[in-house]
Design a protein with these regions (language model features):
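Pre-active-site segment of Zn-dependent metallo-hydrolases
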Residues: 20-61, 73-74, 153-165
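Metallo-beta-lactamase
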Residues: 86-142, 241-254
Length: 254
């Protein structure tokens, strides 16, 4: 059983997966800055769920090292006794920022287990930034969640790994967000990648993420070419099983 709730309209979530309750990529206060304000600063259009209103949770999961996923000011406000599970680059950042907190690395080769839920990090074949990870989260019955907030291109080994599991839910961006190549090129690859992933891993349900039309200023917002999805049209695609969550209500998936 999966219970899921948006914590903002971008890419922060509360998820209950069987007996594990976790908060994913929380950015719940203030703006997010990528390096410098002159480069990129963004704000939510709709206020996120207040921190005190988050349902009870066991852990915090961080998928990327970038501020809109690994938001330090939000993490400072969350209880210190909550363990933080993080992919490689986020782990390194968080260990420096919070030396006294329990921070656990989600590896690419050996699964990390928490309350009988396993996590594996899926990394693209890149050594230069931007590097965007995906997460495979699964239970003892091989039911899984595939989370790729910036989309993902699976190689053959990664596709073989993911296909060992029954993916109940795929959470990925539907937005196409492109910068000049020197600044990273495609940040979010858009619907073509959504369809590619859908055909590769056959999820039962699909939910979009990281698609908020945020207020932004700086060089990135001047140079970015953005194509937001038409969610109503996507809802009408036959046999696609897309669930449009545009509010802060919880839904349960069986």
């Amino acid at each position: 059983m999966i219970k899921i709730k948006r914590l903002n309209l971008d890419s922060s979530w509360y998820i209950k997966f069987n007996k594990l309750n976790f908060v994913l990529d929380p950015w719940l206060i203030g703006s997010e800055i990528d390096g410098f304000k002159w480069l990129n600063e963004q704000w939510h259009i709709k206020p996120p769920v207040p921190i005190d209103d988050i349902p009870n949770y066991d852990s915090i999961v961080i998928s990327q090292n970038y501020e809109d996923h690994c938001h330090i000011e939000t993490l400072k406000r969350l209880p210190n006794d909550k363990s933080i599970l993080a992919t490689e680059k986020a782990y390194n950042k968080l260990k420096k920022q919070f030396p006294n907190r329990e921070i656990i690395r989600i590896d690419t080769k050996n699964e990390m287990e928490k309350n009988k839920i396993n996590f594996i990090s899926i990394k693209p074949p890149k050594i230069m930034d931007p590097i965007y990870f995906a997460l495979l989260i699964y239970d003892q019955d091989n039911n899984g969640i595939f989370y790729a907030p910036h989309g993902f291109t699976l190689d053959e080994n990664q596709k073989e790994l993911v296909n060992k599991f029954k993916i109940k839910l795929m959470i990925t961006t539907f937005t196409e967000f492109k910068l000049p190549k020197i600044m990273g090129g495609y940040v979010n690859p858009g619907m073509s990648n959504v369809y590619e992933l859908y055909n590769q891993i056959s999820p039962k349900y699909i939910i979009n993420t990281h698609d908020e039309k945020k207020k932004a200023k700086g060089l990135v917002s001047l140079l970015a070419k953005i194509k937001y999805p038409d969610l109503e049209s996507i809802e009408n695609i036959k046999d696609f099983n897309f669930i449009n969550i545009d509010n802060y209500k919880s839904i349960t998936l069986n």
